[in-house]
Amino acid sequence: MAKGQSLQDPFLNALRRERIPVSIYLVNGIKLQGQIESFDQFVILLKNTVNQMVYKHAISTVVPARPVSHHSGERGSDRPSEKSED
């Protein structure tokens, strides 16, 4: 798994597993809504009244309808390094 996906995959998996409704905003401004049925390295399958395959490179933002409890299982890649001078 690529280092850049260590946060993305657990987040999307929590949305899928808990069937949390999401709004997905595309880079062209279009808003899609539904539930994440599945995803891989390149696409997200979004389910609503129809299934839509959305390419990740076209996505700007994923907004859950409610808070998500996800645990990455990775070492805190979102935390500052120990050498940071705060």
Curated annotation (Swiss-Prot):
Residues 71-86 have a biased composition (Basic and acidic residues). One of its GO terms (cellular component) is cytosol. CDD domains: Hfq. One of its GO terms (molecular function) is RNA binding. Residues 9-68 form the Sm domain. Gene3D superfamilies: 2.30.30.100. Coiled coil: none annotated. InterPro entries: Hfq (IPR005001), LSM_dom_sf (IPR010920), Sm (IPR047575). Residues 65-86 are annotated as: Disordered. GO terms for biological process: regulation of DNA-templated transcription; regulation of RNA stability; regulation of translation, ncRNA-mediated. Keywords: RNA-binding, Stress response. Belongs to the Hfq family. RNA chaperone that binds small regulatory RNA (sRNAs) and mRNAs to facilitate mRNA translational regulation in response to envelope stress, environmental stress and changes in metabolite concentrations. Also binds with high specificity to tRNAs. PANTHER family: RNA-BINDING PROTEIN HFQ (PTHR34772:SF1). Homohexamer. This is RNA-binding protein Hfq.
